[in-house]
Amino acid sequence: MLHSALSSIFANGIRKRRMNQINKSHRSLCGAKFLIGAVTLFLALAGTGCNDNLSHVGGSVMPPKDALYPHADTLHFDAHSVDIDSVYDRSTYSLLGELSDPLYGNLRASYISRFQYARDYHTEFEPIGGAIDSTFIEVSYAKWVGDSTVWSKVTAYEVKQKLPESRYSGDVQPYLKGASYLGALTYRAGNATGVHKLRIPVSKELGMRFYKASKEHPEYFASQEAFEENLLRGIYLHSTTGNGCMLSVYSTSLVLSYRYQKSDTTRTGADTTYIATAEESFVNTKQLYLHRQFETDRGDVLKKPNSDYAFITSPQGLALSLSVNADELSKTFLKQGSGNTRLINEAALTLAVDPPDVRGSVLQPATYLLLLPADSLGHFFEMGETERSQSNIAFLSSAYNITSRTYVFANISRLIQAHLTKHIHVNDKGVATLDEPLKLIALPVTRETMSGNRNVTATISNYIYPSGARIRLNNGQVRIGVVTTIYAKD
């Protein structure tokens, strides 16, 4: 009963056929997508009002019972900002530094990096005197936000507490108990394009610990667990001073530097020996858990109810909540009249961005937003989904347009229909009811594409980069134009 009733309310099979099939049987008609041309004529009317009946289509070429009636509706989504308590991410990217924005507030970022063990590790060459000369924490970055002329300071600590196996950002303070100071560096961000590196000098004792273990305890390099239990759990990098610049870090390494005697042959064939320098690195990888901490101070102010604006920020900032109540959904999609069936053809969502009205704002809108049901948020990132693998519920916006200042979701009709199909209940008399509101969330994401095909998404991740967008609202709402088609049932 439920399946047949839902099928009569939402026929989702009218797709991709031409108008020259219009005189075929009613069964063929239900399987065709000849409606596209007719529906397109009414797209402009979709956002202008509610329940606007349009002229019927096909009256002169079809039996009366088969006449098609395009219909324009507007769904009113209540919109406001909500906290993103933590963000899930599998990458090696993090942020380091402190940034102030007059609209979005202060943002500070620090992190704990773990390092991949090297099985059966030994130094490639024998260090002179059996000594590691220097040890560094190397922070590699290609981008930064803010003022590159600001002097900042980063301090490195060795973490002594066992770290959780979690890819969610959060408070790292509980894991800093007993942490020991290793070193610090004062720096300014590099202005030139390309890869930049910070080299934080740390205690040579850390490098010697690795060297001695390679000689005396090779079992410490047998597994990641043994490595962290006996040698190094992680390094905490903390932004201590300097406000105005934040680095986008893509790699963190522990570097051991030592001198060794190198034998070679000169151009004349004579043997020679000289002192050379070698460096060996332990790196963080995607297989390890990176523990990020993001601190902001204006989230409570920005998420207060506002009839004109809502805010979207990253990382671990604010997302846009969109919800439409069950009563409005029922009025729009269930009351199509006796003997009629309604098809959802088009549902276009555009989010308009207003530039900040304060001077000195440094945060820019993220390139992409992801729209999906609020209850699917955690599962989506944990399972590594994309808008292709979850095409019925997840929608990626077009790239942010700096000219029109908009994010566009071209057609989210499948998302609406998926909600209706899941939550409509049909009683014994065939009467359909709906009592579950549609709750969506839009948040900043990073999109990576397939090699050789920039049109195909490979991965979608939370946006680990400072961003901010002020979304324009209409009396606390966002309106979505919906075009449907009503046709007579057999």
Predicted regions and their residues:
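Secreted, disulfide-rich extracellular signaling modules
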Residues: L2-D490
